[in-house]
Regions:
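Conserved glycine-rich cofactor-binding loop
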Residues: 21-22
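Active-site loop immediately N-terminal to the catalytic Tyr-X3-Lys motif
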Residues: 102, 153-159
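Substrate-binding pocket helix/loop in short-chain dehydrogenase/reductase
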Residues: 100-113
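Residue(s) in the substrate-gating loop at a strand-loop-helix junction
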Residues: 148
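C-terminal helical subdomain
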Residues: 188, 204-239
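Rossmann-fold cofactor-recognition segment
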Residues: 55-70
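Active-site helix of classical SDR
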Residues: 124, 164
Length: 261
């Protein structure tokens, strides 16, 4: 069952990817540009964005930090002026550092929240009025938040990352309930392990590891089907979904057995 309008034709559509300098965001920008979209890429690393824009004619580099709410408001105003419509916005910005309770650091934990969750709130503050205006004019739009399977339930070494992603998933669910009746699409993406700069420092085995290009294709397929939740690879994520419904006595035992921690 489709929960969103199906996004199957990208030709001429304006797509803003926030967090597009590397990893999934960069691969998604490349795939959407190849599908004919007018891609706008944002992240902190201006040089990488300009390199992308130079190599992909018709795309736009818009450097910013998701922790800077005024910068996001300025970016939306600029896009409204230059592109008119924002057909889709994908929040891919993320920060990850493995953390267990024995190595807890307040500054690092707060940094996870500021980028992974508050960054999304800053985006909403800037973007929602524009999307609602588009909806009232019958033009619609789509907002997608990239969360993680680490947000399903607590996993070892995800003491800072997991709670921030769980909050992002909850936010997407709330947004869908409010915005779907307005004619706006909302989706949440739960990737498993993807070979990105964020996961490169992991010192443990990452099962069912995907390339960023494979992750981007899974997202495009999910939007084309009108899904609310897009999770991949299913051979890994379905097991985590099963863990999510187990009682705590079985859940903790299963996680310890699977991870050895």
């Amino acid at each position: 069952m489709s929960l969103n309008p199906k996004l199957q034709h990208w030709q001429g559509k304006t797509v803003w990817i926030v967090g597009a300098s590397s990893g999934i965001g960069r691969a998604l920008a490349e795939a959407l540009h190849g599908a004919g979209a007018r891609v706008v890429v944002s992240a902190r690393q201006a040089a990488l964005l300009l390199e992308f824009a130079h190599a992909h004619p018709g795309s736009t580099a818009l450097p910013l930090d998701v922790q800077d709410a005024p910068a996001l408001r300025s970016a939306v105003a600029q896009l409204q002026s230059s592109h008119g419509q924002i057909d889709a916005c994908i929040f891919c910005a993320g920060h990850y550092q493995a953390m267990r309770a024995q190595q807890f650091g307040l500054d690092e934990a707060v940094r996870h929240l500021q980028i992974n969750y508050v960054g999304a709130l800053n985006l909403l503050d800037a973007l929602l009025p524009q999307l609602l205006r588009q909806a009232q004019a019958g033009r619609g739009g789509h907002l997608s938040l990239v969360s993680s399977v680490a947000g399903y339930r607590a996993l070892p070494k995800s003491m800072a990352y997991g709670p921030a992603k769980a909050a992002l998933t909850h936010l997407a669910e709330a947004l869908y309930q409010d915005l779907s009746p307005e004619g706006l699409g909302v989706s949440v993406v739960h990737p498993g392990f993807v070979a990105t700069p964020l996961t490169a420092g992991n010192d443990f085995h990452m099962p069912a590891l995907l390339s960023p290009a494979e992750a981007a294709q899974a997202m495009l397929d999910g939007w084309a089907d009108g899904r609310f939740e897009i999770h991949f690879p299913k051979r890994f994520t379905l097991w985590l979904k099963l863990l999510r419904i187990l009682p705590y006595s079985l859940y903790f035992r299963a996680v310890r057995r699977a991870t050895g921690l």
